[in-house]
Amino acid sequence: MDRIHITGGTPLNGTIPISGAKNAALPLMIASLLTGETLELINVPRLADIAALTRILGNHGVDHMVVGKRPGQTAETGQTVRLTASNVIDTTAPYELVSTMRASFWVIAPLLARFGEAKVSLPGGCAIGTRPVDLLLMALEKLGAEIEIDGGYVVAKTKNGLRGTEIDFPKVTVGGTHVALMAAALAYGTTVLDNAAREPEVVDLAECLIKMGARIEGAGTSRIVVEGVARLGGTRHEVLPDRIETGTYAMAVAMTGGDVSLVNTRTDLLASALETLASTGTEVTALPDGIRVRRNGGGISPADVTTDPFPGFPTDLQAQFMALMTLAKGQSRIRETIFENRFMHVQELARLGARIRLDGDLAVVEGVERLKGAPVMATDLRASVSLVIGALAAEGETQINRVYHLDRGFEALEAKLARCGAQIERVRA
């Protein structure tokens, strides 16, 4: 099993190109099942989760072709893919494939909407709480699907097609909004989604669906209206920049000191996180094609955050921000309101010398003068990258084990950091 070795203490300086967003690319790829025509996606990151979904789509009969990379990207980053679902051979998504990645469960929506049936295994993925699929299934049932659970599979059918309806989500759900958008796009009549997720990735999916011929209004607000159409066609669409990768590298610069330009990204994708980062004493400046992050001298000021749905502070940056706060000059309070059991990185940060106390959904971080390198173990995707950030600022060498988590969500991480001066190396098993 691969490991990453990091010798900390080197400020980061240079330029980091931001990849396409995994959390946008996944639903976009799944949307290829809605049409028999070709969907071409630009700026798709090269990640383990993308490869896993490609295998799942291939199992259904979707043809996949890599045709190039985004201009300015290196050989290990970014790709343009063409997906064609003209010969779907199977509407079953088996356990051995779906269990590798939770988002793959979303194939249930386009399969049901286009073919009237789907049999999809209950999902796997990051071990950060239950992440129930109840809200996704509720949305499909509201649209007229008949659903039963049989042997660990969700079996969904519709006799006469899906029907437009009103869906009021009891809590904000990104997955539920993705599923409802895809299903409603081919439903008869009008569907209204209330308390819909406002995340940029939802907007990106909606914009792609509109290019495919869907009639959608209100994406990016809490009320989305979808007028169903009889069929969707192919299109060409560029995946939006990864706001979580952007925030991750911004926090790494803040923690190590230095001056880095993050290019191919946008400030509006993570305004709340950047505002919080600026409050810690880090200089954050908008560039024409990205963001400049600088912290040269001076301590890290403590800051309190509460994770919230967009446009609030992202839960996917909580672990990284906690790593930054371990070196703040004072106490910080971090409250996690989105997912349960998302503090698994705490005990590993403690191995580096962090002082963190947990109280339910609250983490109280007492800043220390320095961290020291140690062997640590990644437990999930975001936790693993928080350990990378901590290790970059720690004295001595840190060995991070189980780094396959990183490969699920961060494209060419070692190469991007090394180009900015980080002493980082992957040791392959």
From Swiss-Prot:
Q: Which UniProt keywords apply?
A: Cell cycle, Cell division, Cell shape, Cell wall biogenesis/degradation, Cytoplasm, Peptidoglycan synthesis, Pyruvate, Transferase
**Which reactions appear under catalytic activity for this entry?**
phosphoenolpyruvate + UDP-N-acetyl-alpha-D-glucosamine = UDP-N-acetyl-3-O-(1-carboxyvinyl)-alpha-D-glucosamine + phosphate
Q: GO biological process: what's one of them?
A: regulation of cell shape
Note the InterPro entries from the entry. Enolpyruvate_Tfrase_dom, Enolpyruvate_Tfrase_sf, MurA_subfamily, RNA3'P_cycl/enolpyr_Trfase_a/b, UDP_GlcNAc_COvinyl_MurA
Which parts of the sequence carry 2-(S-cysteinyl)pyruvic acid O-phosphothioketal? C126
Q: For UDP-N-acetyl-alpha-D-glucosamine, which residues are the binding ones?
A: R102, R131, P132, V133, D134, L135, D316, I338
- What GO molecular-function term can you cite, just one? UDP-N-acetylglucosamine 1-carboxyvinyltransferase activity
Q: Where does phosphoenolpyruvate bind?
A: K22, N23
Q: Which GO terms describe its cellular component?
A: cytoplasm
Q: Specify the superkingdom.
A: Bacteria
Localization annotation: Cytoplasm
Q: What's its EC?
A: 2.5.1.7
Could you tell me which pathway this protein works in? Answer: Cell wall biogenesis; peptidoglycan biosynthesis
PANTHER family referenced in this protein's UniProt entry, alphabetically: UDP-N-ACETYLGLUCOSAMINE 1-CARBOXYVINYLTRANSFERASE (PTHR43783:SF1)
Tell me which family the UniProt entry assigns to this protein: Belongs to the EPSP synthase family. MurA subfamily.
Q: What is this protein called?
A: UDP-N-acetylglucosamine 1-carboxyvinyltransferase
